[in-house]
Amino acid sequence: MISIAVLGYGTVGSGVVEVLEKNKDVINQRAGDEISVKYVLDLRDFPGDPIQEKIVHDIDVIINDPEVQIVVEVMGGVEPAYTFVKRCLEAGKSVATSNKALVAKHGATLLSIAREREINFLFEASVGGGIPIIRALNSSLTADRIEEITGILNGTTNYMLTKMFYEGAQYDEVLKEAHDNGFAERNPEADVEGYDACRKIAILSSLISGHQVDFEDIYTEGITQITKEDMMYAKEMKMTIKLLASSKRDGDHLHAIVAPALLGNEHPLYSVNGVFNAVFVNGNMLGDAMFYGSGAGKLPTASAVVADVVDEAKHLHRNIMTMWKNEKLELLPIEDTEKRFFVRISGDEKMRREETEAAFGAVTFVRAEGLENEFGIITEVMTEGAYRKIAEKFEGILHMIRVEE
């Protein structure tokens, strides 16, 4: 029997216990041994819940018990999660986590400790919930040089943008609806400002480069400035707007960005709607591939965590190699990235056509039915730096959204 401990009995922690119980026969068969929860660490007690007999309040109980071979960390946040996970690894216990904040900040360090002790630190659920993207990068796609990873990595914002697109609603309306339906946190800042997606693409960027990519270095925009009017233009152009997290290779370096983008209806991420997530991968041998599924939620996330537990049970005292060194990779400046830009401009198109073309060069003019005293343009491909220089001097820009090719 393999004894495990679960750190945190919130949404995901209780989901892990539920998955292990409901699917115990198939899980034990695939692990090659019986997996049993011995302890659950939480500050709270749960009277009336069968889990109460396994509740402990002191991490040392888990660390000092040689029977515990695998620890599941689903507490969230960087501390005390980092201290607890580090101590567990140093005590020779493998760890599986869904904690993106922990992995983005300390993933390389924790992987190094696991390597030294011939144990494992796995984190499939930290990026795409139930989407097996990390396992794919570490196994199925190891023969490829990954040229691009672009994903819809946040279910809350994708739900909101989908509602805005199909129902013509404004941002504040769909945020309230997301709250009411349980898709948004009480404080939605991490989701709507793009911070959640940023940490996830930082993890993926670190994995494809083999070096530490700091999430603080990734240019990040959220969806708070997206309006009903933006969606009207998108429909006119047979496009949609998604919050994309993207990492693209340029030689030995990477460009990384999190920002809303306009997608044409031929783009593989165009039809990913609601709370679903998807990751588009391009490899130099594979070509294009898509991974799609539930990016969050109790059971999809717990399922991914338990899959890591099974992997660790099959590899006790044998490290599963993950290339992610502590050496930091400097990202290429966003000013050097090349895109087309959709720009909304105030005023009459006929009156401003000449000055617009003089400033931006050859552009495509766009009108949205029902909108007056404004028009839109799509520029030719230019660098972000070139666009910013033009925009600084050009009066009447209402909003800009990058176009994803």
Name these PLM-found stretches.
Residues 1-90:
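N-terminal glycine-/serine-/threonine-rich beta1-alpha1-beta2 phosphate-ribose binding loop
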Residues 268-323, 330-336:
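ATP-dependent carboxylate/acyl-activation modules
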Residues 309-405:
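A conserved regulatory-domain signal marking ACT and ACT-like small-molecule sensing domains
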Residues 175-271, 276-278:
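Substrate-binding/catalytic subdomain of NAD(P)-dependent oxidoreductase enzymes
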Residues 81-87, 91, 100-138:
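Rossmann-fold NAD(P)-binding glycine/threonine-rich loop
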Residues 68, 115-196, 203:
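Rossmann-like NAD(P)H-binding beta-loop-alpha module
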Residues 260-284, 298, 359-371, 379-381:
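Low-complexity, glycine/alanine/valine/leucine- and proline-rich hydrophobic stretches
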Residues 94-96:
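A short hydrophobic/small-residue beta-strand
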